A protein has these predicted regions:
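Charged, alpha-helix-forming regions
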Residues: 1-113, 119-224
Length: 224
């Protein structure tokens, strides 16, 4: 079930060793043949994109997409529970599930980090992994739709995950989530307009903005 792990690796912060081992990664995907034909072709399109891209540009794109803001956050429970109390219990439950399989996280990692979850699935029996990837399918599908609207090829990874699941995403949930994002973007644009207007008033104070960022996560080696 290394396909799950590979998708998680491709969804992690891009580094040179990943690019250097892309031929091996592609071979594993083909030999395991877990993905449907169409999803496989698209995933190989993504790996080719990674191979042909400048590493620093890939890293810049990754940070812009996944480390800034909420829309494409790779922590699944943030989309489901936000900062609510239920998120903590969901984390505990997931950690316990990991431990039952002898799967333990590195210090500083959060269990709902999607690449980590995919690595865990690679340790599960095939049928169980396919069932479990369906649990966050609405989150996965929503992020994929948002990335596709941004013309980012990273959407291919999210479509690949969907192709592995038995269940289908709820189109109403996806529509509601994308509509909420558009509303949020409109409010942010209004904030920018107000900030620009204040920049030309008589005030001598300068405002500052803060960006919510998530710590870089280390992907496991393919051979493990």
């Amino acid at each position: 079930m290394r396909t799950f792990k590979i998708i998680g690796m491709l969804l992690s912060y891009p580094k040179q060793p990943l690019i250097d081992n892309m031929a091996e990664i592609e071979q594993v995907l083909k030999s395991e043949a877990l993905l449907p034909t169409r999803a496989m072709k698209k995933l190989l399109k993504f790996t080719e994109y990674v191979k042909q891209s400048d590493l620093y540009e890939l890293q810049e794109e990754y940070v812009e997409l996944f480390d800034r803001g909420h829309a494409h956050c790779l922590h699944m429970f943030e989309h489901i529970h936000g900062e609510g109390r239920d998120r903590g219990q969901a984390m505990v439950n997931l950690i316990e599930s990991y431990a039952e399989r002898g799967f333990y996280m590195a210090e500083g990692e959060l269990p709902d980090y999607l690449p980590l979850f995919l690595e865990y699935l690679s340790c599960c029996p095939a049928e169980e992994a396919i069932d479990l990837i369906g649990d966050p399918i609405n989150v996965v599908a929503t992020i994929g739709v948002k990335l596709k609207k941004r013309d980012s090829l990273y959407y291919i990874l999210f479509e690949a995950m969907q192709s592995l699941a038995k269940v289908k995403a709820d189109s109403d949930v996806i529509a509601a989530a994308t509509a909420a994002e558009l509303e949020t973007q409109s409010l942010e644009e209004l904030d920018v307009e107000w900030a620009e207007a204040e920049a030309f008033d008589n005030s001598t104070e300068c405002g500052s903005s803060q960006v919510l960022a998530y710590p870089e996560q280390n992907s496991a080696q393919l051979s493990q």
